[in-house]
Amino acid sequence: MFTSELQIGIASALTAGTLWGIGPLLLKRALKYTNVSAATLIEQHVSVLLLVVLALYTGEIADIDFSGRAFWSFFLAGGVGASFGKVFFYKGIDKVGASKATSVKNSSPFLTALLAVIFLGEEPSGFLAAGVILIVLGVAVLSPGKENGERAVARLRYFLYPLIAAFCFGVNPIFKKIGIDAVNSPVLGTLITQVTALLFMFLFARPIGLEIKWQRVAAPALGLCTLSGITEGLGSLFTFYALSYGPAAILSPIWRISPLVTFALAHFTLRGIEEVTLRDGAAASLIVIGVFVLSRA
């Protein structure tokens, strides 16, 4: 079916993007019945349990080396993206909606490109400038326009949540690629990132506004968060599979199709919960196109 390793990588990245586009829809529905803290922790525990089973089944659990370069790269990927990035992303879903938060979060290659120019001395190009402009336009279209006063200020403040998530997810693929190049164990890499994320959520719960407490969770919320945890865990796994077959610069932007998946399904799955407009779709398209243009830089 696939004629090259890069094609396998592209297919894996597309699968990850599709799964990550479905997850926010499940989570948004779950937030009808529970709060962000409970939803985040349930989802993260499900992801970890799923990956423990997969790591035992594949035997990759035996490859773990706590002193190796791969372990610490996976650890940083989990600490930055899968924990802080995820919490702020879910806060964004709760405050501004699944489609908007997903679009803003997936502007992360924009921040990656800027950091590369500033700190790594990479040369800016026309593709870089065009991609940045498209992404900025997409985020601007999503931002509140006609609202006035305190409501507009509050909406803008809430947009900081997915923007912070975008920053966290922007550096994430770099750590993933370093780790997967050192040890080609995608399941193990995903497991370490997700376990690290869970650990960081407990350690830094207060600063990031996560409430750690026992609470009753309604059955619909538990089911939806469980499904969301499965899509999150498998989506993350497929990004590692993708990076094991090709460069991050090409494959990372491909799994950023998730805003389009979220937008395409939100109209049918979030009816009565979240208003999704053509403006949201246009913004998602601008951001995704911008990400692909950036990849050409």
What are these regions (language model features)?
Residues 1-38, 42-74, 86-96, 137, ...:
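Membrane-interface interhelical linkers
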Residues 15, 42-43, 104-107, 126-130, ...:
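Hydrophobic core positions of alpha-helical segments in small-molecule transporters
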Residues 21, 52, 79-83, 109-114, ...:
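Hydrophobic/small/kink-forming positions within alpha-helical transmembrane segments
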Residues 36-37, 98, 124, 185-186, ...:
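Membrane-helix interface/capping residues of multi-pass secondary transporters
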Residues 39-40, 101, 188-189:
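Juxtamembrane helix-start motifs in multi-pass secondary transporters
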Residues 46-51, 104-118, 133, 196-200, ...:
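Alpha-helical transmembrane segments of compact multi-pass small-molecule transporters, enriched
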Residues 51, 114-120, 126-146, 277-296:
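Hydrophobic transmembrane alpha-helices of multi-pass small-molecule transport proteins
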Residues 77-78, 124-136, 185-196:
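Alpha-helical transmembrane segments
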